[in-house]
């Protein structure tokens, strides 16, 4: 990193910046970080022992997910607020998305972003599925 008179950012300052970002912004950050540093954010998995006989070809693991709002529940206003937070949509667009269930809140998101969005929406009282 260049030291062109710029102050070094502390870990705490980075964390505070992340707290202010939406899930989509964080997902984009992780993707860019992985690209720039040629790393992956996936948790390491312990290697399993090789099977004695060749196993049937496993289905490829899904890497992108859609978050589907199935029902808004009793707390529709809270669900609209969460949809706005997750997607960055305006009030009218978020309301239309919630009113038009089932509807996609996120499309092509990574597993972590999809799970986080699902948890946020469920905490607001919505019924959500990830496909």
Swiss-Prot record:
Keywords: Ribonucleoprotein, Ribosomal protein. One of its GO terms (molecular function) is mRNA binding. It comes from Tropheryma whipplei (strain Twist) (Whipple's bacillus). InterPro entries: Ribosomal_bL12 (IPR000206), Ribosomal_bL12_C (IPR013823), Ribosomal_bL12_C/ClpS-like (IPR014719), Ribosomal_bL12_oligo (IPR008932), Ribosomal_bL12_oligo_N_sf (IPR036235). Pfam families: Ribosomal_L12 (PF00542), Ribosomal_L12_N (PF16320). Forms part of the ribosomal stalk which helps the ribosome interact with GTP-bound translation factors. Is thus essential for accurate translation. One of its GO terms (biological process) is translation. Gene3D superfamilies: 3.30.1390.10, Single helix bin. The keyword Phosphoprotein does not apply. Homodimer. Part of the ribosomal stalk of the 50S ribosomal subunit. Forms a multimeric L10(L12)X complex, where L10 forms an elongated spine to which 2 to 4 L12 dimers bind in a sequential fashion. Binds GTP-bound translation factors. The keyword NAD does not apply. Belongs to the bacterial ribosomal protein bL12 family. This is Large ribosomal subunit protein bL12. SUPFAM superfamilies: ClpS-like, Ribosomal protein L7/12, oligomerisation (N-terminal) domain. GO terms for cellular component: cytosolic large ribosomal subunit.
């Amino acid at each position: 990193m260049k030291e062109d008179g710029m102050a070094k950012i502390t870990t705490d300052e980075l964390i505070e910046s992340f707290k202010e970002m939406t899930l989509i912004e964080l997902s984009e950050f992780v993707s860019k970080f992985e690209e720039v540093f040629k790393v992956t954010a996936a948790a390491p998995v312990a290697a399993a022992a090789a099977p004695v006989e060749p196993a049937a070809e496993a289905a490829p693991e899904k890497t992108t997910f859609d978050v589907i709002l199935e029902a808004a529940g009793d707390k529709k206003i809270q669900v609209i607020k969460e949809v706005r937070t997750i997607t960055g949509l305006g009030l009218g667009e978020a309301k239309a998305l919630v009113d038009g269930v089932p509807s996609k809140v996120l499309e092509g998101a990574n597993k972590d972003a999809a799970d986080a969005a699902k948890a946020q929406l469920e905490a607001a009282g919505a019924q959500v599925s990830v496909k």
